[in-house]
Amino acid sequence: MPHDIDHNTAAQRRTSKLLAAMAIFICLGIVAYIILTLLVNRQTPANPDTHFDAENGISVDYESAIWPVCQMTEDAALGHALQLASGEDSANANYQVVLFQRGDKATYEDFIGQSEADLKAAYGVISPRKVKLQVEGATVTAVRCDIQAYYAVLATIEYDSGDVVYVSGLTKLASISDIVNLVESVSLT
């Protein structure tokens, strides 16, 4: 009988140590997740060195080293839009792109909702989250959708004049501040 008691006590001590080790491991995982989340969502200040007035009446200030491609394009979904991209090759793993379309409230019934539905149909789980963006003289509604190793950023920028800028962007997880800075520099000409 004393042998069984010693055996049970030793087993309980091992179990307690194992549970303590598991708790420490879980806590370290939580801390690592928080640190990574803060790094990914850091707000890097913008240093725009280029101003561009697009044909569609949208102006943007941007960093030419980050956005070397700035041009008007015809997009299948958005039509005539201003495109800023990190390069010409969309197959590049670090490729990021933002499209700006000017319209009014009637251009889309629910731009963000429709875009989320399209992304969900194409990629499955997209995990949309609201993003707080500020554009001077406008009301901004924006979401960030997590798509595997990428973020899709969708926004509507509504001006008092009735004009609306529709924004669609795609970036790597660590580069979301590049798109945030770009969107926050938008104005109408």
Explain the meaning of each model-derived region:
Residues 64-67, 160-189:
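Surface-exposed amphipathic alpha-helical segments
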Residues 1-16:
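N-terminal Lys/Arg-rich, disordered targeting/topogenic segments
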Residues 20-37:
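Hydrophobic membrane-insertion alpha-helices, especially the h-region
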Residues 42-79:
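N-terminal "mature-domain start" segment
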